[in-house]
């Protein structure tokens, strides 16, 4: 039943993304009712071409959605790597909805407007912690901004602090957990996770809905192209070759290779999924700092000339200048004049 509901919803999303073309096809059909001869057959052929295109696209996107769900389910550890704005959190949120096809145990470390998604922190995965439990069998764990929790650029230092997470990382598949971690660079992900990850997901491009007055009904979908790799080494090789082709002025190839476990495909993400999370939910951290500041006076640059040199130096807070321009203590004379 879940698969049928998922298929039907996906069908509606995909059909909705092509609604404008469907209206054009309907218009052609209405016109053809009043035409005869060559014009009728031309319109008939155009309708047939549209129908074949619509059917192929619908099947194409349906298979891609099912393929992504199965890929995540088959890999206990996956990482999503992409620069700022490529849609990493959007993809996690999309999976928070589509993975319900296989399980009801969904956890995330960032807020989602979904009553079925549970809160998770890094302590849930720490075996030295005795306050929060490890998620049960068949759980999907969505972990955004992993760099905020573990500094992947300092693996040796982090290993001392986060050694309690290693048992979970190694035994995730035995626990029936499926986890996804995001980062802007592969080097930002902790080495213990990166090397054991059997799923590498790369958001390559993201076509956002264009918000225009009167056309919002036709622009309620994101189209994301992603690449999936089964090993970090395969991804690094592909990335190196892509950089070389770009440097030579050539187009980067997004060609799937089933033998190497490399696939590229597109998925449609409804705008309603994107509205389930706040991309700036961590802005409360700013308030933690600002609430402790007593003097919150701000200056305009036009007011700087009214300050003394010493006040300017204190205001700009340039440590090197403050250190070197600090008045030296005068040495006292050894004997009276």
UniProtKB/Swiss-Prot annotation:
Keyword Cell wall biogenesis/degradation: no
Source organism: Spiroplasma virus SpV1-R8A2 B
Compartment(s) of residence: Host membrane
Gene3D superfamilies: P-loop containing nucleotide triphosphate hydrolases
Family: Belongs to the plectrovirus ORF2 family.
InterPro entries linked: P-loop_NTPase
Domain of life: Viruses
Disulfide bond recorded as keyword: no
GO CC annotations on file: host cell membrane; membrane
Name of the protein: Uncharacterized protein ORF2
TM segment ranges: 4-24, 26-46
Keywords of this entry: Host membrane, Membrane, Transmembrane, Transmembrane helix
Broad class of the protein's primary localization: host cell
Membrane-topology annotation of the record: Multi-pass membrane protein
């Amino acid at each position: 039943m879940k698969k049928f509901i998922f298929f039907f919803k996906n069908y509606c999303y995909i059909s909705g993304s092509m609604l404008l073309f469907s209206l054009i096809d309907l218009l052609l059909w209405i016109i053809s009712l009043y035409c005869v001869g060559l014009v009728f057959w031309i319109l008939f052929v155009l309708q047939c071409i549209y129908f074949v295109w619509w059917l192929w696209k619908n099947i194409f996107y349906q298979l891609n959605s099912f393929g992504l769900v199965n890929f995540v389910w088959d890999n206990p550890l996956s990482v999503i790597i992409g620069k700022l704005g490529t849609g990493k959190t959007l993809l996690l949120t999309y999976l928070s909805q589509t993975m319900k096809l296989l399980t009801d145990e969904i956890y995330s470390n960032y807020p989602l407007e979904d009553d079925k998604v549970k809160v998770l922190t890094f302590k849930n995965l720490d075996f030295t912690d005795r306050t929060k439990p490890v998620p049960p069998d068949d759980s999907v764990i969505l972990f955004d901004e992993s760099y905020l929790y573990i500094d992947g650029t300092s693996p040796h230092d982090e290993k001392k602090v986060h050694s309690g997470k290693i048992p979970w990382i190694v035994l995730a598949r035995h626990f029936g957990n499926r986890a996804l971690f995001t980062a802007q660079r592969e080097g930002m992900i902790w080495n213990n996770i990166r090397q054991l990850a059997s799923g590498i997901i790369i958001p390559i491009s993201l076509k956002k809905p264009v918000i225009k007055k009167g056309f919002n009904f036709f622009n309620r979908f994101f189209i994301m192209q992603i690449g999936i790799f089964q090993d970090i080494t395969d991804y690094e090789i592909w990335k190196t070759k892509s950089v070389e082709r770009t440097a030579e002025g050539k187009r980067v190839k997004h060609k799937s290779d089933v033998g190497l476990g490399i696939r590229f495909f597109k998925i449609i993400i409804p705008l309603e999924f994107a509205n389930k999370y706040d991309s700036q939910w961590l802005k409360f951290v700013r308030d933690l700092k600002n609430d402790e500041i007593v003097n919150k006076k701000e200056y305009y640059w036009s007011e700087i000339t009214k300050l003394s040199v010493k006040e300017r130096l204190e205001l700009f807070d340039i440590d090197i200048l403050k250190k070197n321009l600090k008045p030296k203590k005068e040495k006292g004379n050894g004997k009276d004049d």
